[in-house]
Amino acid sequence: MCIRDRNIENTLFRLLELGALPIVNENDTVTTEEIGIGDNDTLSAIVAILVKADLLVLLSDIDGLYTADPHKDPTAQRINEVPAITPEILALGGACGSSLGTGGMRTKLHAAELVTAAGTDMVIANGSAPQLLYDIAAGRRAGTRFLGRKDL
């Protein structure tokens, strides 16, 4: 782990020890090109890995990962669980962002790739239904769950 990552990790853990809720935002006005990650989905994955989170939850404008774009294809089916990130899963990410973000499903799948490789589960759920966070915290099915590798 490089010094920068260690400093970030120490800062986040100290803030958590103090009872603070760290807010980390890639689109912050103080973000510079030299330190920019590129999007909040990737940044959240990096932070989840650094703090050794049990679960990363990403909120979107749809209910999870679908077999096709549900905004365009009425036959699209939500995928409840993804045991591994495969080329087929990555292909479902498409190339464009959601109406609310810059990266859309593509960057969420990249985040899933990062955290699941580190052994952390991830959920993509609908941000317009914040009560889903209670279901997710209770272990109930909501959105799409990506399973972290357990062979680490």
Residue ranges, per PLM feature:
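C-terminal catalytic "cap/lid" subdomain
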Residues: 4-152
